[in-house]
């Protein structure tokens, strides 16, 4: 299957890489007008970028074309404009290395994503919309801790190389999941870990956001 990738979120690019390992042809899409050459479109964008991405490609998709987005913060409803144009729309957000939160509209798309996940050795999990934000906050916190642990273990020579699975540290989604971290009573830990990860991984936007949130004059909710 020929898959076009629009965007550069880490979650999306890691998902695309796994599809490529499974034998699919992956190509970065520079011009949406070229979409007719592809069987599927992967929107590798964060939740805050999703509406713009849908607008970018809407005029160029075709009926029965598979469209997948990979942000855990948004369900398949975010692709409604493409669904009305006849696309097979799917939300499929990787949660770690083995599972994937999916959201579909019918049995056809459920079967499509089920087959794709089988090919890339991932297990589908139907995640209720009302649980997305909380689950995202917990997962992003865990992945940030994992990144810190891996770097520390490498520096201490506990491990010889950085693990092959790079965590999906997408700044926009990490920041947008923060309200759930506040509700869960983990706001301070979330901010502290985000600041350290931003500094360690040289993700300036994430580091500066965390520093501002830590400032005593800020409303940290």
PLM region spans:
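Conserved beta-strand termini and adjacent loop/short-helix elements that scaffold enzyme active sites
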Residues: 29-31, 92, 127-129
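NAD(P)+-binding Rossmann beta1-loop-alpha1 motif at the extreme N-terminus of oxidoreductases
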Residues: 1-36, 158
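Rossmann-like NAD(P)(H) cofactor-binding subdomain of soluble oxidoreductases
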Residues: 32-98
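Structural motif
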Residues: 5-10, 44-47, 70-72, 103-107, ...
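Glycine-rich beta-alpha junction loops
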Residues: 72-74, 96, 131, 178-182
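Internal alpha-helical scaffold of NAD(P)-dependent oxidoreductase catalytic cores
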Residues: 15, 21, 82-85, 97-175
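Interdomain hinge/lid region at the active-site interface
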Residues: 154-221
């Amino acid at each position: 299957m020929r898959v076009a990738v629009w965007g550069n979120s880490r979650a999306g690019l890691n998902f695309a890489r796994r599809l490529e390992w499974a034998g699919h042809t992956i190509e970065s899409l520079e011009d949406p007008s070229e979409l007719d050459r592809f069987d599927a479109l992967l929107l590798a964008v964060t939740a805050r970028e999703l509406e713009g991405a849908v607008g970018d490609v809407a005029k160029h998709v075709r009926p029965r074309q598979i469209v997948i987005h990979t942000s855990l913060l948004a369900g398949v409803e975010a692709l409604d404009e493409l669904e009305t144009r006849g696309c097979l729309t799917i939300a499929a957000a990787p949660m770690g290395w083995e599972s994937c939160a999916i959201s579909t509209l019918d049995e056809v798309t459920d079967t499509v994503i089920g087959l794709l996940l089988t090919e890339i050795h991932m297990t589908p999990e139907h995640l209720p919309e009302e649980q997305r934000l909380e689950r995202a906050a917990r997962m992003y916190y865990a992945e940030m801790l994992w990144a810190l642990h891996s770097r520390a273990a490498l520096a201490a020579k506990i491990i010889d190389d950085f693990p092959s699975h790079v965590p999906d540290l997408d700044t926009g989604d990490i920041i947008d999941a923060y309200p759930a971290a506040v509700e869960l009573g983990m706001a301070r830990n979330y901010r502290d870990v985000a600041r350290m990860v931003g500094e360690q991984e040289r993700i300036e936007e994430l580091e500066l956001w965390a520093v501002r949130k830590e400032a005593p004059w800020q409303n940290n909710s």
